[in-house]
Amino acid sequence: MTTTIFQQTNHTLDAIGLRCPEPVMMVRMNIRKIASGETLLIKCDDPSTARDIPSFCRFMEHELLAKQTDTLPFLYVIKKN
């Protein structure tokens, strides 16, 4: 089995079932709790996250390391700046 970036994160947030603006609010709360340089995997199914999570990362100067939005659940990996 191949290990992917989605399997190598420090923390995980399950936001499945939440709708805008809740997923990004949860990401913000969780990012605040982790150390700089650590990673957060977000699992969600809200289509608006395809726009909102990359925008959040740009605005807050965190690094979006990976995203998978072709199938559900959508997956994002953010590295805290």
From Swiss-Prot:
One of its GO terms (biological process) is tRNA wobble position uridine thiolation. GO terms for molecular function: sulfur carrier activity. The keyword Cytoplasm applies. SUPFAM superfamilies: SirA-like. Pfam families: TusA. The keyword Cytoplasm applies. GO terms for cellular component: cytoplasm. Keywords: Cytoplasm. The active site is at C20 (cysteine persulfide intermediate). It is found in: Cytoplasm. Sulfur carrier protein which probably makes part of a sulfur-relay system. Belongs to the sulfur carrier protein TusA family. NCBIfam families: PRK00299.1 (NF001423). This is Sulfur carrier protein TusA.
